[in-house]
Amino acid sequence: MEVIICSDEQAVGRIAADRIAKVLGRAKAPVLGVATGSTPLTTYSSLAALAAEGKADFTDLRAFALDEYIGLPADDERSYAATIRHTVTEQLGLDPANVHTPDGMADDLDAACAAYETAIQEADGVDVQILGIGANGHIGFNEPTSSLSSRTRVKTLAERTKADNARFFEEGEKVPSHCVTQGLGTIMDARNVVLLAIGANKADALAGAVEGPVSAMCPASVLQFHPHVLVIADDAAASKLTMAEYFRWTDSQRGDLSGAM
C-alpha cells in the first residue's frame, strides 16, 4: 500500500484526482469505479476541474458504481443512481449510457447481480476503483463478516451503516435495509484502487484496514492483498495509524516516484 496523509479534505480530493486522471489517461478504453457518500465529492469536483482546465479528457470514460439500495428507482433522488448522475455523470460530462449502477429494482435480483458482473467483465474490468470506508470498515456495502472473495450480490445493511446514511434522507424517512453491492472479490479485480478516508470517525476503520490483520470483521483489510492500492486520508482519519510518521516520511521522500498509481 501507498499511504498519503493530507492536511484536509480538499487536499485529499486534489491528490486523488491527479493520480486517478493519470491512470485513466494511460488506458485505451478507461473504466472508473465510482463510490457514493460524502467522502469522494472533492475528488469528483477536482476531476471536473482538471477536465475544465484541459488537463484530462473523460469523453470516452465508462463508469461502474459500487452499489444501490433495493427498492429505490433510478429517478428517486435518494437512490445511488441519482447521486452518481449528479456527482459524476453531469459533473464530468459523461455519456449517461456509459455510466452503470446495479439494478435495485429488478424482479430477479440474483440475475441482475450476475448481469452486473458480466457487464464489468465485458468492459475489460475497472482501471481505477474509488472507495470510501465505513466507520465499521465496510467498503461498498460489504459489511463486517462479508466473504473476502464475494461477488456482486444482495446484502443486508448493518444498523450502524443505516444510521450513518440517515443524513442523506429526510427526517422520518426510512433508510432501506437491503442493497445490491459489488463484492470484495469484485472490487479486488480492479487494476488499481484508491481508498479515501476523511474525518476522525473513520480513524479506527482506517487503522484496521491498513495496519490490522486481514479479517472479515474489517472488510477493507482485504485490500492489503491488492498489489496497487493508494490510500489518501486527512490528518483526522489517519490519527490512529501507528505508522503515520513513516507514511509522511515516505511521501516527503518520494519526489517524482510513485507506485502503479
From Swiss-Prot:
Keywords from the named record: Carbohydrate metabolism, Hydrolase
Coiled-coil ranges (or none): none
Name of the featured protein: Glucosamine-6-phosphate deaminase
Catalysed reactions, semicolon-separated: alpha-D-glucosamine 6-phosphate + H2O = beta-D-fructose 6-phosphate + NH4(+)
Any Gene Ontology biological process: N-acetylglucosamine catabolic process
NCBIfam families: nagB, PRK00443.1-4
Catalytic residues in the record: D67, N136, H138, E143
GO CC annotations on file: cytoplasm
EC number: 3.5.99.6
Protein origin, superkingdom: Bacteria
Naturally occurring in which organism (per UniProt): Cutibacterium acnes (strain DSM 16379 / KPA171202)
